[in-house]
Amino acid sequence: KRQGSYNMIVAMSKVLEKAGGFQTVNVNPDSPGGMGAPYLFASGNTDLAFINGAPAKWAMEEGTLGKPATSGYAAVIGGLTAVCYINCVSNAFLQKYNVSTIEEIFEQKLPLRIGCSAKGSMDAEGAYLLLEYFGVTEDDLKSWGGSITNQGGDANADAIADGQIDFYIDHTSSASSTMAQIATSVDVTFLQWGDDLCSWFVSEKGFDLITIPANSFKGQDKELTLPGTPDCVFCKESLSEDVVYAITKSLSENRDALVAEYNSLSPWEPETAWEEMKRGGCPLHPGAEKYYKEAGYMK
């Protein structure tokens, strides 16, 4: 999954070299995960990075992953992807306990075995945020007979098929291959979360609400609206206005070619890429603002 982001960044760097007049753009393949990415700028070696909007804001305000708050970065392009907390639970679990919602599962203290990615990823953060919302610790969950297992997508798909986990959550899009694989191999229900839970993610955590069309996955016959926070391009705050203007302009003007290469970028609309919700409420770099105003997208 991070591989996908890496490939998109390489494609963007080629645009900057060809169309943006930048000599060489080096891409570092190391990714600290969505929650750690804001800290890349503190080292001084990073000029541009892909970060989800909400954790970029959390890192500025209170810090993430137990680290102190950080700064030194600003938004360039928001809303590149339409990703959200797609989640599914095995029908065997729902039938066994006669429940149909995530709220009932937590309120009844059921032994839910959760599968998600590595700690520090935006994917796993969804599981920990659910616990936070319901006022439950990981020890509480264990005392009910539940658990959180951190592992890769394929391992989670195998685990839910083998009955080792009951619930899988990922910060992903309607094009998720892991969700598609699970839906075709196991009887699962894709859960729509209640209004209170979704609103908490928006008002307390800076998420947006993203709609996943009906029938994106086998057995998912209703559309889902779930909290998510889009991938964004952030830059080092100290980059000059001219440089960031040139970056924003060349990427925005080559949006169609990039989307043709990477369909997951199709939600990116330069006309709205500056909007606050699209960038997690983080400050916009003045160079990016200059481009959006000049293009007539921003007043």
Regions found by a protein language model. Give the residues of each.
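Loop/turn elements at helix/coil->beta-strand transitions in domains of secreted/extracellular proteins
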Residues: 21-23, 45-48, 71-74, 109-113, ...
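N-terminal segment of the mature folded domain
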Residues: 33-84
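Ligand-binding clefts/hinges and TM-proximal coupling segments of bilobed small-molecule sensing domains
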Residues: 100-129, 208-272, 276
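Pocket-lining segment of extracytoplasmic ligand-binding domains
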Residues: 53-55, 61-64, 71-77, 92-94, ...
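Active-site catalytic pocket residues across diverse enzymes, especially alpha/beta-hydrolases
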Residues: 16, 20, 45, 63-64, ...
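An extracytoplasmic/periplasmic, membrane-proximal ligand-sensing/linker region
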Residues: 8, 162, 167, 172-184, ...
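Extracytoplasmic/secreted proteins, especially bacterial periplasmic and envelope-associated proteins
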Residues: 4-11, 15, 36, 40, ...
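Bilobed "Venus flytrap"/periplasmic-binding protein-like clamshell domains
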Residues: 1-30, 85-162, 274, 278-287
